[in-house]
Amino acid sequence: MITVALAKGALLNDSVARFQSAGLDFSAVLDPGNRQLMVPSHCGRARALLVRNGDVPVYVAYGQAQLGVVGYDVLREHQMPVAQLVDLGFGGCRMAVAVKASSGYQHAADLPPHCRVASKFTHCAREFFDALDLPVELVHLTGSVELGPLTGIAEAIVDLVATGRTLRDNGLVAIEELFQSSARLIGHPLALRLDRGDLQLIVEAMRIQESLPKNPA
């Protein structure tokens, strides 16, 4: 049986739609009354695991799921040994450095050495500032990192930005982009090598789907 790790939250609806187009119907996970965390597909040849976003690559890396869908930001942060198979094109956002709009900083390199930077993504932040050769103290927060500069716990933040509205509403502005992120189909490397064709059919169906021209909004 094929096991697929799906992230709860913003990526779930589009993830289910992509697998449905590839022949696996996990629409039962979208039922408001569903409380199951392991849900079989309608065809009975696959099942979905409903997990936290950051746990998707963990389940795939350890082989408990052969496939999964997760944001590129999570892959960059956790560095798990999984195969990145298809950029699915939804869940688009960017990882960025943001500061108070009144701070006067224009670029990340303008930040003072050894200042505090708050983030949920401390690995990504460390890589970025190390590449700038700018020593900073990273403060790991698990939610509402926008409060960092507002309370004075940090001079800047590194966080995901979609529309930028949350930053603007809190008097912050993005000054530098680390990378773009979107949802990715990932796989367990050994499972893919031992695959008798079932996994490859799903991967190819999704790859073909992403190569088709998109209808204009």
Swiss-Prot record:
Task: Please give the Gene Ontology molecular function terms for this protein.
Answer: ATP binding; ATP phosphoribosyltransferase activity
Q: In which pathway does it act?
A: Amino-acid biosynthesis; L-histidine biosynthesis; L-histidine from 5-phospho-alpha-D-ribose 1-diphosphate: step 1/9
* Catalysis: reaction(s): 1-(5-phospho-beta-D-ribosyl)-ATP + diphosphate = 5-phospho-alpha-D-ribose 1-diphosphate + ATP
Against SUPFAM superfamilies, the record matches this protein to:
Periplasmic binding protein-like II (SSF53850)
Q: Which UniProt keywords apply?
A: Amino-acid biosynthesis, ATP-binding, Cytoplasm, Glycosyltransferase, Histidine biosynthesis, Nucleotide-binding, Transferase
Q: Which GO terms describe its cellular component?
A: cytoplasm
Subcellular location(s) per record: Cytoplasm
User: What's the superkingdom here?
Assistant: Bacteria
Q: Principal place where this protein is found? A: cytoplasm
Enzyme Commission number(s) from the entry: 2.4.2.17
Key word Cytoplasm present? yes
Q: Does the keyword Cytoplasm apply?
A: yes
The Gene Ontology biological process annotation of the record reads: L-histidine biosynthetic process
Instruction: Give the family this protein belongs to, as stated in its UniProt record.
Output: Belongs to the ATP phosphoribosyltransferase family. Short subfamily.
- Task performed by this protein: Catalyzes the condensation of ATP and 5-phosphoribose 1-diphosphate to form N'-(5'-phosphoribosyl)-ATP (PR-ATP). Has a crucial role in the pathway because the rate of histidine biosynthesis seems to be controlled primarily by regulation of HisG enzymatic activity.
Report what the protein is called.
ATP phosphoribosyltransferase
Protein's gene: hisG
